[in-house]
C-alpha cells in the first residue's frame, strides 16, 4: 500500500477538520471485497466521582444489533458489508470498574478474532474513558485490537471534540475524526467521516497515518460552543 499521512494537527478537533473523505464523486469498485469490522467502547468519565460504572451500566450492542441501530444504519450505503463485533456505551459518569472493562474487552477481542482476516476496523469511541488502574484505556483498546488484526489492517476511530490523545493511540490508530459541533449535532456525520476515510483508503490502496503535536492551549466548556 502507498503510505500517506492524512492527518497533521495538534488536537482531535483539528484532526476532524483535516479529515479527507471520498465525498460524492463517482468511485471505482473495490479490486476485491474488503473485510471491515465495527466495534468500540465509549464513556465520558469524571475521575473525581466515587461512583463506578459497572457492567450493568453499559448499553451493549452485539452482532447484527449494531447494524440495525439508528446510529449505524447509514453503513448500508456502502458497497461493502461491515462485520459487527461489540459496541458498548456507558454515557457520562464515574470511572469504569476494571472488571467491567476487562469483560467487555475480552468479549470484543473474541468476536474480532472470529472475523479474521480483516482489512479494516472502524471503532466507535468517545475518547474520555477512565478505567480503574489504567492511565490510557483507549490506547489499551487500540493496542489490543492491533495485536489481533496485525500491522496491515487499517484502524479508524471517531471521537468527541475533547477526546484524549496519547503516543500509544497514535502508534496504533491510522485515522481519527471528531465532532465539529458543540452541542454535538453532527454525530452521524462524524461517524461517516471515519468510515468514509477507511473505505476510501481501502479502495485506493492508501495507508493513512497520524502525526501528533501538542499545543499549550486549554478551553473552558463555555468557550467551546459552536452555536453562539
What spans do the regions from the language model cover?
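N-terminal export signals
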Residues: 5-24
Amino acid at each position: 500500500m502507498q503510505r500517506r499521512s492524512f492527518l497533521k494537527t495538534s488536537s482531535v478537533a483539528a484532526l476532524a477538520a483535516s479529515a479527507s473523505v471520498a465525498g460524492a464523486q463517482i468511485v471505482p469498485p473495490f479490486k476485491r471485497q474488503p473485510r471491515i469490522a465495527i466495534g468500540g467502547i465509549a464513556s465520558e468519565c469524571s475521575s473525581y466521582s466515587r461512583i463506578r460504572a459497572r457492567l450493568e451500566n453499559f448499553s451493549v450492542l452485539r452482532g447484527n444489533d449494531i447494524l440495525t441501530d439508528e446510529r449505524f444504519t447509514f453503513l448500508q450505503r456502502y458497497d461493502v458489508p461491515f462485520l459487527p463485533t461489540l459496541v458498548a456505551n456507558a454515557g457520562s459518569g464515574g470511572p469504569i470498574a476494571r472488571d467491567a472493562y476487562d469483560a467487555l474487552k475480552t468479549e470484543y477481542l473474541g468476536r474480532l478474532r472470529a472475523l479474521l482476516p480483516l482489512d479494516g476496523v472502524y471503532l466507535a469511541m468517545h475518547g474520555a474513558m477512565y478505567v480503574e488502574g489504567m492511565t490510557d484505556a483507549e490506547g489499551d483498546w487500540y493496542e489490543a485490537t492491533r495485536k489481533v488484526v496485525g500491522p496491515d489492517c487499517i484502524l479508524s476511530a471517531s471521537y468527541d471534540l475533547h477526546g484524549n490523545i496519547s503516543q500509544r493511540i497514535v502508534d496504533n490508530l491510522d485515522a481519527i475524526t471528531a465532532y465539529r459541533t458543540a452541542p454535538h449535532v453532527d454525530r452521524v456525520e462524524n461517524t461517516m467521516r471515519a468510515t468514509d476515510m477507511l473505505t476510501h483508503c481501502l479502495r485506493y490502496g492508501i495507508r493513512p497515518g497520524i502525526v501528533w503535536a501538542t499545543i499549550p492551549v486549554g478551553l473552558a466548556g463555555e468557550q467551546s460552543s459552536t452555536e453562539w
